[in-house]
A protein has these predicted regions:
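Short hydrophobic/aromatic beta-strand immediately N-terminal to the Walker A/P-loop
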Residues: 25-28, 54, 249
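Walker A/P-loop
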Residues: 22-42
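Inter-Walker segment of RecA-like/P-loop motor cores
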Residues: 56, 60-97
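P-loop (Walker A) phosphate-binding loop of NTP-binding proteins
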Residues: 30-31, 58, 253
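Conserved helicase motor "Helicase C" RecA-like lobe of SF1/SF2 P-loop NTPases
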Residues: 249-257
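Interdomain helical connector at the RecA1-RecA2 junction of SF1/SF2 helicase-like NTPases
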Residues: 137-246
């Protein structure tokens, strides 16, 4: 018996059937497989002339992928039924205004999103490429409660099926500058200078000394933000980009980058 070939369309159809069969569920699907397209096809399935849906995204930049996909499918008319918001602004919306909520990057869910979700009575479809690893974590608990993962298709599966090209991970060690050229601001409006090396050592110590939980999470975010601002990192990434001779995807923390 010939083994069924797995391709992008097969995965999308399988995931869509799962979404149709569950009032609330999550789809954990690798990047490059078409999570946004699945969500739009789900909206098509649920469509009625009065339907109103809320798409929740980490940043408004991600909303662009929805408009791009709507255009590809020649479904631009659906956009008038869609409202976009960020996870930060979710609580500003009235749960009674929407029939469906699409949680794009649903691994971003936190306890404070209960303000909206606990009152929302409609359908929820969560989309993620990186579902929470720990079911007892804040994100794991929220995903399990509001959009439990019912379908998985990992990056490895996508690669093995030739949906994605094979990839390799290269860890680059960055040598931070020891020159005192990094400008920092004081609370009183003043400024002072330090080196990237000293600054990273300082923020790393803050992470090490932070209490477990939210304090450590916040300290880790501040360390990441510090690293994003280092000129050495930007110059090094640009030097790598200049050496590229094959097609690739470049991920950045912000649209500006």
């Amino acid at each position: 018996m010939q083994e069924k070939k797995i391709n992008r369309t097969n995965v999308q159809l399988e995931a869509l059937e799962i979404a149709k069969a569950n009032k609330r569920c999550g789809l954990a699907i690798s990047m490059g497989v078409g999570k946004t397209r699945i969500a739009i096809q789900h909206l098509q399935y649920c469509y009625n002339p009065l339907i109103e849906v809320l798409v929740v995204v980490p940043t408004h930049a991600i909303a662009g992928s929805w408009f791009t996909e709507l255009d590809k499918l020649n479904l631009g008319n659906l956009s008038k039924h869609i409202t976009f918001t960020t996870y930060i602004s979710l609580k500003k919306h009235n749960p009674n205004d929407y029939d469906i909520v699409y949680l794009d990057e649903c691994h971003s869910l936190l306890y404070n999103h209960e303000i909206f979700l606990s009152q929302f009575k409609g359908k929820i479809l969560g989309l993620t490429g990186t579902p929470p690893k720990h079911s007892d974590s804040e994100k794991g608990i929220m995903v399990s409660k509001y959009c439990p993962i019912k379908y998985k298709f990992t990056v490895d599966q996508a690669t093995d099926s030739n949906i994605l090209n094979n990839y390799k991970i290269i860890v680059h060690q960055l040598e931070l500058s020891k020159t005192s050229s990094l400008k920092k601001s004081k609370k009183n409006g003043g400024q002072w200078f330090t080196s990237e090396f000293k600054d990273y050592h300082y923020v790393s110590n803050r992470v090490a000394q932070a209490n477990p939980g939210k304090q450590k999470q916040f300290a880790a975010i501040m360390r990441m933000r510090a690293l994003m601002q280092y000129n050495t990192k930007e110059l090094y990434v640009k030097s790598l980009a200049n050496k590229l001779n094959t097609k690739c995807i470049i991920f950045a923390n912000t649209q500006k980058q």
